[in-house]
Amino acid sequence: VSQQESDGYRDHSSYLNKSLFFKHAREFQNINLKFNLLYFDSPYAFDPGGLTIELVDENRSQARDRNVLYNSQESVKQLQTGLVLNWNTKIGQVNSNIYYSNRDFIGLLPFTYGGYVELNRDFSGAEFSLKNRSESFEWMIGTSIQNQADDRKRFENNEGEKGVKVLDQIESFKSLGAFALGSFNKSKYSIQAGLRYDIHEISSDDYMLDIGIDQQYIDYSKSMSAFSPSLGLVYSLSKNRELYINYGYAYETPSLSELSANPNGTGFNENLSPMSSSGFDLGFRKQSQDLSYSLTAFYIDTKDEIVRYELEGFEGMNFYRNLGTSKRLGAELEASYNLGKPGVLNASYTQAKYEFENQGISGDLAGIPKSNFSLEWLYAYKNLDLNLDLKYVNSLFADNNNEVKVPSYLLSNIALKNKVNFKGVSLDIGLHIRNLFDEKYYDNIRANAFGNRFYEPASLRQFILSIKTSF
């Protein structure tokens, strides 16, 4: 059971979150069963909106005036449950997973037409797999099915009051997939290969109200399918040192929320296409009792990347379009060192280029820093846990035209937790200090926002008391 409540750093940014999580596991002779249940309730989370840099310099804690006028906020209620069942057979181990979630969402956006949103989402699915291994070969085959149904309505937002309905549509996303994985293992090397095939069916039943005349019915349906192969090689240099190389191809369909954000009005945005990516990574890793680290170089080539943008008169609402081709080329370093009694140090560093080309125009992808660094110290003594982290994020561009640059920042947080048990009830009491050095930075950049309202200033130094219980 948990509850989070805050007045927010900025005006019009308070929120309340409540959640209940239940987990139960049972073991039988050849069967393992796990059941999870999560209920989440956020009655309100106000949105202060994005600011121009001039407004940030004037008062970084202020909210955008239109967000206050239209009472921009959202409320969410979500129920999520799942059942995992694993058992052994003569031909291998069967793993199954069945899940369901329901989400009720109400959102108020800072404009009139369509600015009051009601969404009810049902999401369900199942996955089944069979795996086995011999002395030198491992394999897995499986299938998955998913179904998402969104009942989406939009109304006029009359300065925080619900107005007339302007959109009413039922959206559906169905997916059926099959996959196979194999690994051929020898003492010095391992060859891994995989193949997945997915079929997607996306549809929309749109009831668009024709004011003063009648009701108009619009139907949209589209099928998509694709193969996603992968291939990898791991070569052992010694007992704890490995070289590895991987190739993979994947594609991603637009989500229902992205498709329904149609700049031409109701219905789906038929100009929005799936994005596809192919990539390589080459790396080295070493593991020992006290030190482990990995160094990876990567290259990803993406076609029809889906990016967000805003339109005049609909500021605060995300629209989406495909952005030609993009390339990601870089390197990542991760390391973990066991200090013994003083704890554990974890560190990571990324340096990369994220570039795009669209209709003869090229530049850096908006909203992605070229480099970042993080350092974390974990210390534990009896029931006391201490976590100190430091993160550096390089500068980035806020727009695809690369005209507005957001400065870099250095952020540090500290968390102290103590666990107390009382009559079978476990209490985790914590003190968190966020932004320890009082850094002025932005916790979100609204890439390609209209009117240069890119900036959502983050809180300065903040003290948080938390109490968590489980039983």
Indicate residue ranges for each PLM-predicted region.
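Gram-negative outer-membrane beta-barrel transporters
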Residues: 133-136, 185-187, 297-301, 319-399, ...
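Outer-membrane beta-barrel proteins
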Residues: 4-27, 66-78, 111-125, 167-170, ...
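Surface-exposed extracellular loop regions of Gram-negative outer-membrane beta-barrel proteins
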Residues: 50, 54, 147-158, 201-212, ...
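Flexible loop and strand-edge segments within Gram-negative outer membrane beta-barrel domains
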Residues: 6-13, 31-87, 94, 102-121, ...
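Repeated loop/turn-to-beta-strand initiation elements of outer-membrane beta-barrel proteins
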Residues: 30-33, 91-94, 136-139, 188-191, ...
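Outer-membrane beta-barrel signature, preferentially recognizing the C-terminal barrel domain
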Residues: 58-84, 167-175, 218-228, 232, ...
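Signature of Gram-negative outer-membrane beta-barrel scaffolds
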Residues: 143-238
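C-terminal beta-signal and adjacent terminal beta-strands/loops
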Residues: 298-303, 340-341, 345, 395-397, ...
